[in-house]
């Protein structure tokens, strides 16, 4: 499908409607690392300390909008125990045998359940 692909990997006001849709899907579902200029990188899925050269995790980006807002997100199961202000990763690899995680907004803490083994 034309909806999937690695390009465009950088926003431009000159993108076609199809390219805008593809970029948006990639930014919301696949973005993990980006360059200072906003270029997205899709190959690496490891933890933030294993970032590709010249790329940073999107939530550590120096120009990140809404830095003072709490951001809860998933779809990055290799991300472990991030200690970054207002950043709350919720995907802790349940499907890979780790744990299912939620965040208690009232008490401000994570709640986790170890993945069950099904035979």
Where are these regions (language model features)?
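Feature recognizes metal-dependent phosphohydrolase scaffolds
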Residues: 1-119
């Amino acid at each position: 499908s034309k909806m999937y692909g690695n390009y465009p990997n950088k926003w431009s006001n000159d993108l076609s409607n199809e390219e805008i849709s593809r970029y948006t899907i990639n930014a919301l579902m696949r973005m993990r690392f980006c360059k200072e200029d906003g270029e997205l990188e899709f190959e690496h899925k490891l933890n933030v300390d294993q970032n590709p050269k010249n790329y940073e995790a999107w939530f550590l980006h120096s120009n990140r909008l809404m830095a003072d807002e709490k951001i809860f997100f998933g779809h990055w199961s290799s991300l472990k125990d991030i200690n970054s202000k207002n950043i709350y990763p919720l995907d802790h690899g349940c499907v890979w045998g780790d744990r299912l995680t939620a965040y208690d907004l009232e008490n401000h803490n994570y709640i986790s359940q170890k993945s069950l083994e099904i035979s």
